[in-house]
């Protein structure tokens, strides 16, 4: 009993409510998703609301779980590569990159310079693909209809660059342990460079629509603030870290491939809110465009091999027609696959959403003993309850949009 006529009732599930005379006050539970258009895939949030205020946010995951890590244990290293396109299916080649890096470090393979440049070029195209989708759909989540239409127009052009390099628009499977599948024709490099000259104009258009838009700022400023302590507690990475003022980027902090040769800035925010994360992504697209220019220039001037020659790469067609050993090598490579020496390694890349890592345990056979995938979106989604507490129901979709979550990598 409480003082006066206010009594507390306790229920079997441990929840309580207050009874004031005849009236009961109990928090309202609401399902957000998995069919909700702002849920970015198959996310289900169980929200506990006190009026309009979100008291608790419980993410339910697993609706896109396919057991990728277990499936990888029964496939050869090369057969596992396409699984990585299906994790974060918005900016695909960055995930392939992490897998190839892990295998190359385990086997001590040196990637030819031209292949490194092609990888950097296509990883940055993937970064722009990702940020274009995120920035424009974040705008859609808070009520702006035009940016997604403009963003998808540019994404279509980038998808065609993917298709011209690999034959596929989305699931490219273009990287290989030891290099890339095939060389880029000179016309493609020219077309990418031309596109990169025109793209900043489109960014200026989106900038003009959103950055100083009163409604967009009201919906995003001071929403979902992330502090230095939160970053360490929740394991944030990528834009979630840089939006709070910390210039942590694996391309600079732990350079891989030939990123240390490129000139680019690391955009950082100041307040760590949804709006600063949006500004970081906009600035990152401009920096990626600079890297694309530099990569195209280097590719024009540096012809060469695109695969390291050895047991991990297929022989040329010409060799296979004249050499029995080359034919046997080709057959064994695509049936049994190459063997990776025993050991374990962690390889990570600065994917568009944050640090995407692969912890690979090899037992000396042609299949991985265990591969653990470290998806950035998984760590970010964990913090939904923490970030949404005390905000209004309408702010939940703004926070979700700024986390940049794709369910392929969260559920795996």
Swiss-Prot record:
Reaction catalyzed: a quinone + NADH + 5 H(+)(in) = a quinol + NAD(+) + 4 H(+)(out)
Location of the protein in the cell: Cell inner membrane
Domain of life: Bacteria
Membrane topology: Peripheral membrane protein
InterPro entries in the record: NADH_Q_OxRdtase_suD, NADH_UbQ_OxRdtase_49kDa_CS, NDH1_su_D/H, NiFe-Hase_large
Gene: nuoD
Cellular component, GO annotation: plasma membrane
Subunit structure: NDH-1 is composed of 14 different subunits. Subunits NuoB, C, D, E, F, and G constitute the peripheral sector of the complex.
Family matches, as Gene3D superfamilies: Cytochrome-c3 Hydrogenase, chain B
Family (UniProt): Belongs to the complex I 49 kDa subunit family.
Keywords: Cell inner membrane, Cell membrane, Membrane, NAD, Quinone, Translocase, Transport, Ubiquinone
Name recorded for this polypeptide: NADH-quinone oxidoreductase subunit D
Keyword Aminoacyl-tRNA synthetase: no
Its job: NDH-1 shuttles electrons from NADH, via FMN and iron-sulfur (Fe-S) centers, to quinones in the respiratory chain. The immediate electron acceptor for the enzyme in this species is believed to be ubiquinone. Couples the redox reaction to proton translocation (for every two electrons transferred, four hydrogen ions are translocated across the cytoplasmic membrane), and thus conserves the redox energy in a proton gradient.
EC numbers: 7.1.1.-
GO molecular function (one): NADH:ubiquinone reductase (non-electrogenic) activity
PANTHER family: NADH DEHYDROGENASE [UBIQUINONE] IRON-SULFUR PROTEIN 2, MITOCHONDRIAL, NADH-UBIQUINONE OXIDOREDUCTASE 49 KDA SUBUNIT
């Amino acid at each position: 009993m409480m003082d006066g006529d206010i009594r507390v009732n306790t229920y079997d599930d441990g929840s309580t409510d207050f009874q004031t005379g005849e009236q009961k006050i109990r928090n309202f539970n609401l399902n957000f998703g998995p069919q909700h258009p702002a849920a970015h895939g198959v996310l289900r949030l169980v929200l506990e609301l006190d009026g309009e205020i979100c008291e608790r946010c419980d993410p339910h995951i697993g609706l896109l779980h396919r057991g990728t890590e277990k499936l990888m244990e029964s496939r050869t290293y090369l057969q596992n590569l396409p699984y990585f396109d299906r994790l974060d299916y918005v900016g695909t080649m960055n995930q392939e990159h992490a897998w190839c890096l892990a295998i190359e470090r385990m086997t001590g393979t040196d990637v030819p310079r031209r292949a490194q440049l092609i990888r950097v070029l296509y990883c940055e195209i993937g970064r722009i693909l990702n940020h274009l989708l995120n920035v424009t759909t974040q705008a859609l989540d808070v009520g702006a209809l035009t940016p997604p239409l403009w963003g998808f127009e540019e994404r279509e052009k980038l998808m065609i660059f993917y298709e011209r390099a690999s034959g596929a628009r989305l699931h490219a499977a273009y990287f290989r342990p030891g290099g890339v599948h095939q060389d880029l024709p000179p016309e493609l490099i020219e077309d990418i460079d031309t596109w990169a000259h025109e793209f900043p104009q489109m960014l200026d258009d989106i900038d003009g629509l959103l950055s100083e838009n009163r409604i967009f700022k009201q919906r995003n400023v001071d929403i979902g603030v992330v502090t230095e302590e939160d970053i360490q507690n929740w394991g944030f990475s990528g834009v979630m870290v840089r939006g709070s003022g910390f210039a942590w980027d694996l391309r600079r902090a732990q350079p891989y491939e030939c990123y240390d040769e490129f000139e680019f800035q690391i955009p950082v925010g100041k307040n760590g809110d949804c709006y600063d994360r949006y500004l970081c992504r906009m600035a990152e697209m401009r920096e990626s465009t600079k890297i694309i220019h530099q990569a195209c220039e280097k590719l024009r001037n540096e012809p060469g091999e695109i695969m390291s020659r050895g047991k991990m790469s297929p022989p040329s067609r010409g060799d296979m027609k004249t050499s029995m050993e080359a034919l046997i090598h080709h057959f064994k490579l695509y049936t049994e696959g190459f063997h990776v020496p025993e050991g374990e390694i962690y390889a990570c890349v600065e994917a568009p959403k944050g640090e995407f890592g692969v912890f690979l345990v090899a037992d000396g056979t042609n299949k991985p003993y265990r591969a653990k995938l470290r998806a950035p979106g998984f760590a970010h989604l964990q913090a939904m309850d923490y970030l949404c507490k005390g905000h209004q129901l309408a702010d939940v979709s703004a926070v979700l949009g700024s986390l940049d979550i794709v369910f392929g990598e969260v559920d795996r």
